[in-house]
A protein has these predicted regions:
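Structural motif corresponding to the C-terminal cap of alpha-helices
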Residues: 26, 30, 49-53, 100-108
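Secondary-structure capping and boundary motifs in well-ordered enzyme cores
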Residues: 34-38, 65, 120
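Conserved ATP-binding N-box helix of the HATPase_c
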Residues: 36-61, 124-131
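ATP-lid-like helix-loop hinge signature
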Residues: 47-77, 81-85
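GHKL-type ATPase core
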Residues: 2-12, 69-92, 103-223, 230
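Bergerat-fold GHKL ATPase/HATPase_c domain
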Residues: 1-46, 95, 109-110
Length: 239
């Protein structure tokens, strides 16, 4: 056991930086470092997809719950902007996934991008990325397919080459797909029950979007799936 220090001086003060701001104190963002906090992190990614649907972009949201406890959320929205932002002089993927308090939902009252939105605007995607063991993001927009890979809050790839860009493989279709594994080094429990995806506030919000039903798929090791429309009364079917 380390000996307790008795000196409390100027060098005793330190600041958490980058991913450590969430990884060491997840409760500050998500309200808990337990299962509820982990569920909140999932809610943040789901709510981004639902915000797109409620604005009329995309008709289906698919949430897949894998046996290894990773989660995938895929929408048919406009696709998260991830390319270079001349105004901020940074890539948007850095702002969205690696910078707290950055996003496109701060001017809602002006009708800028969203009339209304769920979640921790400007915090959710980044905080969930920071708290994950890994995260894979794929975006289809502007005629391109953009791919990103993160591990424990950090982008993977050579500096300047983290964002992979290739011609789209979906024609004119756009959208965002996010798959990640909540990190047990951050949360004490990541075994989210299937009913959460049906009964969560995000699911209820999706059910109110009549033109955009959200579909839950529970994937098994044999790759079979069970689907149900996300509404307050729906339940996940057992494969």
């Amino acid at each position: 056991m380390a000996q307790k220090k008795t000196v409390y001086g100027n060098e005793s003060i330190s600041a958490l930086k980058g991913a450590e701001r969430v990884r060491k104190r997840p409760g500050v963002i998500f309200g808990s470092d337990g299962l509820e906090g982990c569920e909140h992190s999932v809610f943040e990614i789901m709510s981004n997809a639902i915000d797109e649907a409620r604005e009329g972009h995309g008709r289906v949201i698919t949430v897949t719950r894998y046996n290894d406890r990773s989660i995938q959320v895929e929408d048919m929205g406009r696709g998260c902007p991830v390319d270079y932002n001349p105004k901020e002089k940074r890539f948007n993927w850095e702002l969205v996934y690696c910078e707290l308090y950055a996003g496109g939902k701060y001017n809602n009252l002006d009708g800028d991008n969203y009339e209304y939105s769920l979640g921790l605007n400007g915090l959710g995607a980044c905080a969930t990325q920071y708290s994950s063991r890994y995260m894979d993001v794929t975006v289809w927009r502007d005629g391109n397919k953009y791919s990103l890979h993160f591990e424990r809050g950090e982008p993977v790839g050579k500096k300047g080459d983290e964002l992979r860009i290739e011609p789209t493989d979906r024609g004119r279709k756009t959208g965002t797909r996010t798959r990640w594994l909540p990190d047990l080094d951050v949360f004490t429990d990541i075994d989210i029950p299937a009913d959460y995806y049906v009964e969560t506030r995000a699911s209820r919000s999706a059910s109110k979007t009549k033109s955009s039903p959200a579909t839950l798929r529970r994937r098994t090791s044999s790759t079979k799936t069970a689907s149900s429309t996300m509404s307050p009364r729906s339940r996940v079917k057992t494969p």
